[in-house]
Structure formats: C-alpha cells, structure tokens
Amino acid sequence: MGDNTTVAPGTNQTLVEEDLGAQITHTLMVQIMSKLNEMLTEYQPQIIGIGATVLAIFVIMFISLLIILGCNCIRPYNFKNLKRYITGKASKSVEYQPLKMSAVNMGMDEDDEFLA
C-alpha cells in the first residue's frame, strides 16, 4: 500500500487520506466565512441603512418622474402636443413649444421685479 492510503477499521476497504491542499482550502473557506459572518453581524445596521437609503432615493425619483410626466397643473396641452409630436400624429399646426419662463407664467404681474 502507498503512503496516502489506510484501511478502514473492521473492513477491507482502502480509504485515501485527504489531500493537504483540500484541507488548507477548507480551513481558509471556514475562516473567510466566519469572518464575513462576523462582519455582517457587526455592520448590519449600516448595511440596512445604506440599502434603505438607496431604495428611498429610487422611490422618490420614480414618484417625481410620475408627477412630472403626469402633472396637469403646468400646461396640460403641452404634454398632449408633445406626445402627438413624438408619435408623428401631429398636424402642421400642432408643434411642441417648450415652456418659456416669464413673469406671467410664474404668477407675477408684468410690473413686478425679480428679486436678485
């Protein structure tokens, strides 16, 4: 028999001893997993906080997008014209006009001055 084989007690079966590399790999994996588990339990509140913050940012961005695209308080006909313009169903008289900033649009009288 070779150096790396043994006979199982009470049987005639030959067992091959574990390779040293496999033992080292197993030991390293156990140490790495225990260290990861330790770090996760230690930093769990921070990880959950960061995840919740990122999720909240995405939810706020999505809701803001819905509000911006579905807002009828600015100029509802501009969004309808934009949709027709993009889809190519706009007639020659209907073209998309971007919103213009003016004192009248902002609810100011024409004689009011902008504050610097």
From Swiss-Prot:
Coiled coil: none annotated. The keyword Glycoprotein applies. GO terms for cellular component: host cell membrane; membrane. Its main location: host cell. Residues 1-46 are extracellular. It is found in: Host membrane. This is Uncharacterized protein ORF80. It comes from Ostreid herpesvirus 1 (isolate France) (OsHV-1).
